[in-house]
């Protein structure tokens, strides 16, 4: 397995004029169409003041998905790599002491250097900590430049295989259906901060969508290419789960099946009590075993 192609970022950079044109044609705001360099400072940053059950459940889902994917690489017999946590893993919730300071620090880092992905994959034998999140941004980014790829991990409450099987049967039965497959979801506003990270670190990146039965992934280059070519392989929607923000939707079948769960996760209930006495209960996925598709991972590396 070789280190990523040195012209990876250059190839994405060449797509940007067409990306901007496509997004502008779809009515995306000008502020989301400025790629490269540090972003402008926001005049006012709204800081979350309270974390409720839905936020806590979503964070628990994300933590589980990231852990399941990391474990699949560590237990793979066909791929020898090192893997490290790299993205922001702040355990503080809105309203807790220290949250405001950490939130503002993370926003400023992202503005200057881009949004860092959750995991980094390194060639076997690379001497690297298993968790880079405690390092300074500069130190962590130095390690990122040695990586094969970064992986942004997304979670879903669906079983992808079951979803697609039901939709196929609906089509046979001529039942109306709006979407035949789940989608990779990328907020339009995230494109420029993903691009900024690529610009700073010059390491390729993937998006991985972890379901309760499988995991699918796509290279970020392909995401930019779909947008640049205005391909029919993507749409822009404003789903409620994304706070009605413009979101790029690409069918997971346009990517690669990165893994399948041989053991399904279980679920536990966790409870958090706020300082004012409000009790929030939420579900946390636990365990499960994701078996990595080694050939799919190799295909995803450009």
Regions found by a protein language model. Give the residues of each.
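Interdomain/boundary linker segments immediately adjacent to catalytic/signaling cores
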Residues: 1-110
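Soluble or luminal CAZymes and related metallo-dependent hydrolases
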Residues: 61-65, 185-190
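A structural signal for short, well-ordered beta-strand segments and their strand-loop junctions
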Residues: 82-85, 150-152, 205-210
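Short catalytic/ligand-binding loop motif for oxyanion handling, primarily in non-cytosolic enzymes
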Residues: 91-92, 129, 158-162, 214-220
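Catalytic micro-motifs at enzyme active sites that drive phosphoryl/nucleotidyl and oxygen chemistry
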Residues: 103-111, 135-141, 194-197
């Amino acid at each position: 397995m070789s280190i990523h192609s040195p012209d990876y970022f250059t190839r994405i950079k060449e797509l940007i004029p067409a990306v901007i044109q496509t997004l502008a044609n779809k009515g995306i705001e000008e502020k989301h169409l400025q790629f490269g360099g540090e972003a402008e400072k926001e005049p006012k940053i709204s800081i979350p003041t309270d974390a409720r059950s839905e936020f806590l459940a979503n964070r628990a889902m994300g933590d589980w998905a990231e852990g399941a994917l990391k474990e699949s690489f560590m237990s793979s017999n066909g791929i020898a790599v090192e893997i490290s946590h790299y993205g922001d893993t702040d355990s503080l919730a809105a309203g807790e002491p220290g949250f405001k300071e950490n939130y503002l620090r993370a926003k400023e880092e992202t503005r200057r250097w881009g949004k860092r992905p959750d995991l980094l994959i390194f060639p076997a034998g690379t001497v690297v900590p298993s968790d880079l999140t405690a390092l300074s941004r500069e130190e962590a980014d130095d390690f990122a430049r040695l990586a094969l790829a970064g992986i942004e991990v997304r979670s879903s409450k669906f079983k992808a295989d079951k979803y697609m099987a039901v939709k196929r049967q609906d089509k046979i039965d001529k039942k109306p259906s709006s979407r035949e497959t789940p989608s990779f979801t990328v907020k339009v506003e995230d494109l420029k901060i993903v691009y900024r990270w690529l610009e700073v670190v010059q390491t390729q990146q993937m998006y991985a969508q972890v379901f309760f039965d499988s995991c699918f992934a796509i290279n970020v280059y392909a995401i930019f290419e779909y947008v640049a070519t205005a391909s029919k392989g993507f749409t822009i929607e404003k789903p409620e789960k994304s706070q009605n923000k413009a979101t790029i939707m690409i069918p997971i079948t346009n990517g690669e099946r990165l893994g399948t769960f041989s053991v399904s996760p279980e679920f536990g209930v966790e409870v958090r009590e706020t300082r004012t006495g409000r009790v929030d209960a939420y579900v946390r996925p636990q365990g499960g075993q994701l078996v990595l598709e080694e050939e799919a991972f190799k295909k995803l590396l450009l």
